[in-house]
């Protein structure tokens, strides 16, 4: 985490060497950042962390209000929560095994075994899925690189013949117990 210190340009001018009149360069975790010193205050990001948590602090001095303020929020982990995090790593490996088994099903042919209706097929009021066959296109457990708990993790593609339109392709998300795998 990064923290910010706000310093007035007068303080910066008194402290910095004369060769750097235009910009103050501050190092941060994400790299180096140039900050214009002509603004009313300057924020210099820093990082504070301990073995049990992270601290987020802000120190500010402004021209309008000469009083300085320091504000800190600290997130601290107890020893029990550190142990719990270690236990979660073993359960995470079990989840990845389940995910790998489910991802092996991608591309498999399936048949819907429960009575389901969908209402999102264009120009068709409703479509009954019971007994329809389709293909598993995706197993949705990651969104933008983060693990999510999807209620309907299997994305299944169906093709239905509609009178006057020909075959219409649509997708539906299903649970694992709502379909059965068909042997090729």
From Swiss-Prot:
Pfam families: FeThRed_A. SUPFAM superfamilies: Electron transport accessory proteins. Residues 1-71 form a transit peptide. The keyword Oxidoreductase applies. Keywords: Chloroplast, Oxidoreductase, Plastid, Transit peptide. One of its GO terms (molecular function) is oxidoreductase activity. GO terms for biological process: photosynthesis. The keyword Oxidoreductase applies. GO terms for cellular component: chloroplast. It is found in: Plastid, Chloroplast. InterPro entries: Elect_transpt_acc-like_dom_sf, Fd_thioredoxin_Rdtase_alpha, FTRV. Heterodimer of subunit A (variable subunit) and subunit B (catalytic subunit). Heterodimeric FTR forms a complex with ferredoxin and thioredoxin. Belongs to the ferredoxin thioredoxin reductase alpha subunit family. This is Ferredoxin-thioredoxin reductase subunit A2, chloroplastic. It comes from Arabidopsis thaliana (Mouse-ear cress). The lineage of its organism: Eukaryota, Viridiplantae, Streptophyta, Embryophyta, Tracheophyta.
């Amino acid at each position: 985490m990064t923290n910010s210190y706000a310093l007035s340009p007068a303080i910066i001018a008194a402290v910095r060497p004369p060769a750097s009149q235009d910009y103050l360069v501050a190092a941060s975790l994400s790299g180096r950042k140039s900050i214009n010193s002509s603004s009313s205050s300057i924020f210099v990001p820093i990082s504070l962390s301990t073995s049990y948590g992270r601290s987020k602090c802000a120190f500010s001095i402004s021209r309008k209000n000469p009083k300085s303020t320091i504000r800190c929020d600290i997130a601290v982990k107890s020893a029990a929560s550190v142990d719990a995090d270690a236990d979660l790593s073993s359960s995470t490996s079990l989840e990845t095994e389940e995910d790998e088994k489910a991802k092996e099903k991608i591309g498999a042919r399936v048949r819907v075994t429960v009575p389901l209706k969908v209402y999102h097929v264009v120009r068709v009021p409703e479509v009954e899925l019971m007994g329809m066959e389709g293909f598993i296109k995706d197993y949705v457990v990651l969104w933008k690189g983060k693990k999510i708990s999807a209620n309907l993790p299997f994305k299944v593609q169906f093709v239905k013949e509609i009178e006057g339109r020909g075959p219409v392709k649509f997708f539906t998300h299903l649970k694992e117990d709502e379909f059965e795998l068909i042997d090729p």
